[in-house]
Amino acid sequence: GAHLEAIRAAGGLRVVTPSRDFLARPTCVTDNPAEVGTVDYILFCTKDYDMERGVAEIRPMIGQNTKILPLLNGADIAERMRTYLPDTVVWKGCVYISARKSAPGLITLEADRELFYFGSGLPEQTDDEVRLAELLTAAGIRAYNPTDIDWYIMKKFMMISVTATATAYFDKPI
C-alpha cells in the first residue's frame, strides 16, 4: 500500500523521535514474504486480531532453524502462536514503545524509552539468543535477554491491563 510505496520512494523508513530523526534503510522492502526466503529470526509485530493471517503470511520465511519472536501484547501470545506453528521454535518477548505511523513512510515515537525484552524461556541463554541480542544491540536497540522472560511479559500485561481499565473508565486516551 501507500506505506510500502513511501518507503521505497524515500529509500527507507523515516523515524522521528524526541531526540533524533533518521532514515532506516532496510536491504529488502516488500509485501511478499516469499521474496525474502527463509530467515534466522522473525520479529512478529502485529495486532492480536491479525495473528492467524500474519502467521499464514510469514510461512514462506520459516525454515528449519527459524526462531519466531512474537511481540504482541498479552500473557499467552507465544503459546497461541505455537498452536499455529507446532514445528517451529517460538520464543517470548515484549516491547515498551510508544510509536505510531504518522503518515505513509513515517513512524513517530513519543518518547526515547524503548525497551525490548526477549527469551526462549529456557533456564540458560542459547547461542541463538546471544546472537540476536548482539544483532539488536548493533542496530541501536536496547535489547535485554533475561532468563525470566515470563516475569517481564506479566509485568507489561499488568501495566496494560490497569491502563486500559483507566482509559476505558474515564473515556480518555493516555
Spans of features found by a protein language model:
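Rossmann-like NAD(P)(H) cofactor-binding subdomain of soluble oxidoreductases
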Residues: 21-106
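Structured helix-beta-strand junction loops
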Residues: 10, 64-65, 139
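Short secondary-structure capping/turn micro-motifs that flank functional sites
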Residues: 3-5, 24, 99, 152-153
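Extended, non-catalytic scaffold segments that flank or surround catalytic motifs
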Residues: 2-3, 43
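Glycine-rich phosphate-binding loop and adjoining beta1-alpha1-beta2 segment
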Residues: 3-22
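Short, charged/polar "capping" segments at the starts of alpha-helices
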Residues: 3-6, 78-79, 126
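Internal alpha-helical scaffold of NAD(P)-dependent oxidoreductase catalytic cores
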Residues: 60-61, 84-89, 104-174
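Short, conserved catalytic or adaptor-binding loops enriched in Gly and charged residues
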Residues: 18-24, 134-137
